[in-house]
Amino acid sequence: MIDLPKVYSGKVRDLYEVDDDHLLMVATDRLSAFDVVFTDLIPGKGKILTQMSNCWFAFFGNRVPNHLSDLMLDDVLPEKEVQAIAQRAVVVKKLQPVKIEAVVRGYLAGGGWKEYQAKGSISEITLPAGLQRASALPQALFTPSTKAGVGTHDAVSYTHLTLPTSDLV
């Protein structure tokens, strides 16, 4: 149990208020697909998600600004709570999120299948004719969409997908 006010519970992450400038972000073991959160958990998933994210933040270093804070878990939580969420949580700065969902598709399913049926493509990428539902795609596809409520995602055109590069220098 975390003795901080919970401010948000997402599909796989929970946010707790640390102070006016910081949040505690905890990656859970919840499983979600197609906007559905399943009742079964994947033990250790939250730790792996956090380690993967931290790996990328370290790789990009200060070349790409991010939400990580200099505060450590033991700066904001008692030792017992730190042990319970070790390796699955980070203290982050309160910032405005970039509401883009990064979807990588290996199979023709879900919204990708619907778009393929209508257009023969997914996210402006033309696919071979005659593919069936759940067919393996010729290569993995990056198909970004807006991060929104359940069932309300909109595809994002590659021409509109840009980083605020002026902030990166």
Predicted features by range, described:
Residues M1-A148:
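Active-site loop/lid in soluble adenylation, ligation, and acyl-transfer enzymes
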Residues G151:
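Feature captures the catalytic ectodomains and active-site-proximal regions of enzymes
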Residues A155-S157:
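Acidic, proline/serine/threonine- and glycine-rich low-complexity intrinsically disordered segments
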Residues T159-T165:
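Conserved small/polar residues in nucleotide/adenosyl-binding loops
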